[in-house]
Amino acid sequence: MPSLQKTKNRIALIDNIKKITKAMELVATSKMKKTQKHFLEVNEFSQSVLDIFSKIVSQIDPQIKLYPDGQKNSTLYIVISSDIGLAGSYNSNIFKILNSNIKNEDKLILIGQKAINFFSNRQDQIIETFKALPDYVTYKIAKLISDSALNSFLNKDVNQIKVVYTKFINLINQQEKISTILPIKKNPMKSEIKENAILEFEPDVESVFHKAIPLYLASIIFGFLTESKVSELAARRTAMESASKNAIDLIGNLKIEYNQTRQAKITQEISEIVAGSVE
């Protein structure tokens, strides 16, 4: 028969844990709402830059080479994770999809302490690491990351750059993704700029293209960083909400167990008293 005091202590312990998970859920919800607004603003900016850049690419003669020759057959992965856990499968899903694609000759730029820890056995593949990013990711941070990635590309260390991030679908669902950001294919997507719009490039479209690449990369990475942050907070909110509900259920079961044990003990004591009086 379980000890009444032991069961009571377990109830108190789980109740304290529930208070912590509930507080973390509320904090994540508050942060997520603010970060989601930031993401929508950044996404609008990133999409505008991408739209203009797509138009630039569409104006370039297909015969013209946009990128340096002699690049190594290697991919640079920019991996966006979190610094802390308690976010369900947010980080593990990122690592799983990357492990399914990465090769020994590939390179890594790791964002977030979780990715840094997970890939610590791939030190020879790591170009740079970033951690302790704020909830409100700034363009300056995105620029630092994009500059590091672009240097590897222009130095011919890699022949393509991909971002491993978490796409925000809604408050419940987020999806890990791998997106190629360099090289850019001709006419990568339909531009929202009107087809009859007249664009003039000085001194020429190729020069504008090469000048615009840093802005394009930083803007796209900026969007991925903010989207991943929203996804992280949404995943943490869901995980803490689930933990709080599980704690409530467990406390309920323990209270039933406590009452049953208490009732059994009382019944046993009554039986002993009755048996003693009969004797």
UniProtKB/Swiss-Prot annotation:
A GO BP term, please? proton motive force-driven plasma membrane ATP synthesis
Full protein name: ATP synthase gamma chain
Record's Gene Ontology CC terms?
Answer: plasma membrane; proton-transporting ATP synthase complex
Q: How does it assemble?
A: F-type ATPases have 2 components, CF(1) - the catalytic core - and CF(0) - the membrane proton channel. CF(1) has five subunits: alpha(3), beta(3), gamma(1), delta(1), epsilon(1). CF(0) has three main subunits: a, b and c.
Report the membrane topology from the UniProt record: Peripheral membrane protein
State the Gene Ontology terms under molecular function. Answer: ATP binding; proton-transporting ATP synthase activity, rotational mechanism
- Function recorded in the entry: Produces ATP from ADP in the presence of a proton gradient across the membrane. The gamma chain is believed to be important in regulating ATPase activity and the flow of protons through the CF(0) complex.
Q: Does the keyword Membrane apply?
A: yes
Residues of the signal sequence? none
